[in-house]
Amino acid sequence: MKYSLDTNIFIDGFRNEEAQAEVLAFLNRALPFTYLSAVVMQELCAGGRSADVVRGLERGVFGPFERRRRVFAPSSAAFVESGRVVSVIAASEGWQLFDERPSFLNDALIAASCREQGITLITRDGDFKRLATFVKGFRYALPWPTPTANIQ
């Protein structure tokens, strides 16, 4: 099984020592099966707020995945599928797409690209439950203690 950590898992690890220990323990067990989404990389850089923080991400987080060639990016088909999914959900729920849920676009893109790669997303973000009903074959799991016990 292949895994990818969602942005919220990394952020939790940056903000909290206990969460950081959980992330590191997971990576120690599952690193040979773990990939990094280019969309997650973009979100982490956008939240970095300084060149020093972004350089730290590049060295400490992105670099190990890049050296192992374990970074994946969405295909053009994933972009189209995620756009269609967001359009359907936005219309059915009556939201102004970019005003009310801008991060949902990236979530849909992550879901579609994980599905393409056969990767299970490890996340705490509840939006992925809804996305899983629209992105057929997409799998996600809650992070701890063992993600494989929570695969949806």
Language model features: what each stretch is:
Residues 6-7, 44, 82, 114:
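Generic structural signal for small/hydrophobic residues in well-ordered secondary structure
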Residues 111-152:
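Acidic, PIN/NYN-like endoribonuclease modules and their adjacent C-terminal/linker elements
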